[in-house]
């Protein structure tokens, strides 16, 4: 067995250890977590956070960087790596497909390397972490990105290796778009609404009350998922 074959086999075993459970409740949690509708309030709050705290002259540029991050992550995954690498998803892998648990029969597309969901999640989170510069915000959104990514393995549509590579790519692209933002605005002294008080504002000038509101919506979304999973059929 070559080193690559050994790595692939280890990835299969790790994936199967995460994939699925005997709990209908956790299957429902995963199903709700992957629902776009659940996260609409959080997305709106994130946009509100930017509008309230980014200098009006630079707001459009920041929003452009958000869009650019999503486009780069998505296209690099779907248009470059997946058709180039041709790595089958766990639900399509003939060696393990009969052992993979799915939710409501969803199996995804043919190829899964690397995970666009993981790349997008970590790309956006990285960009926001660098923009907001708040410890608790950073921890909360990183946890969100990790869960959002690993659930793709839980429902059987990505190997753990797909997730790890996607997360790394996302972090790099999020850092890259933030670097572009810094490059464009390097001579703008007013790019942040900077204030002296570290109690009321983050180091980049974001109001902590707005950050707290974002975190409340995030944990509120978690609560909706956990409670809603009790009633989902």
Please provide the spans of the model-predicted regions.
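Membrane-water interface at transmembrane helix exits
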Residues: 47-51, 73, 77-86, 129, ...
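Membrane-embedded catalytic cores of phosphoryl/pyrophosphoryl-handling enzymes
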Residues: 101-233
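Hydrophobic alpha-helical transmembrane segments
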Residues: 34-50, 64, 117-120, 140
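Hydrophobic, lipid-facing residues on alpha-helical transmembrane segments of integral membrane proteins
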Residues: 37, 64-76, 80, 164, ...
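N-terminal signal-anchor transmembrane alpha helix
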Residues: 1-3, 64-84, 219-225
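Interfacial segments of alpha-helical transmembrane regions
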Residues: 48-76, 137-140
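N-terminal transmembrane-helix/juxtamembrane module of multi-pass inner/ER membrane proteins
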Residues: 1-42, 77-107, 228-233
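Hydrophobic core of alpha-helical transmembrane segments in multi-pass integral membrane proteins
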Residues: 41-50, 67-71, 213-228
């Amino acid at each position: 067995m070559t080193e690559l074959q050994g790595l692939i086999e280890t990835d299969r075993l790790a994936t199967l250890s995460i994939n699925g459970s005997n709990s209908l409740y956790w299957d429902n949690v995963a199903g709700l977590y992957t629902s776009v509708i659940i996260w609409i309030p959080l997305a709106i709050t994130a946009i509100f956070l930017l509008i309230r705290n980014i200098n009006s002259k630079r707001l459009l540029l920041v929003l452009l960087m958000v869009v650019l991050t999503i486009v780069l992550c998505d296209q690099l995954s779907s248009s470059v790596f997946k058709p180039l690498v041709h790595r089958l998803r766990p639900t399509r892998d003939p060696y393990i497909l009969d052992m993979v648990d799915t939710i409501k029969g969803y199996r995804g597309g043919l190829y899964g390397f690397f995970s666009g969901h993981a790349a997008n999640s970590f790309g956006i989170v990285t960009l926001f972490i660098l923009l907001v510069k708040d410890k608790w915000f950073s921890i909360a959104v990183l946890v969100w990105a990790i869960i959002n990514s690993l659930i793709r393995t839980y429902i059987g549509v990505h190997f753990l290796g797909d997730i790890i590579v996607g997360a790394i790519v996302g972090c790099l692209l999020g850092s890259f778009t933030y670097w572009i933002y810094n490059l464009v605005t390097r001579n703008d002294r007013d790019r942040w609404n900077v204030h002296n008080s570290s109690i009321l504002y983050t180091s980049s000038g974001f109001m902590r009350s707005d950050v707290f509101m974002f975190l409340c919506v995030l944990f509120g979304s978690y609560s909706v998922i956990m409670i809603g999973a009790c009633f989902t059929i």
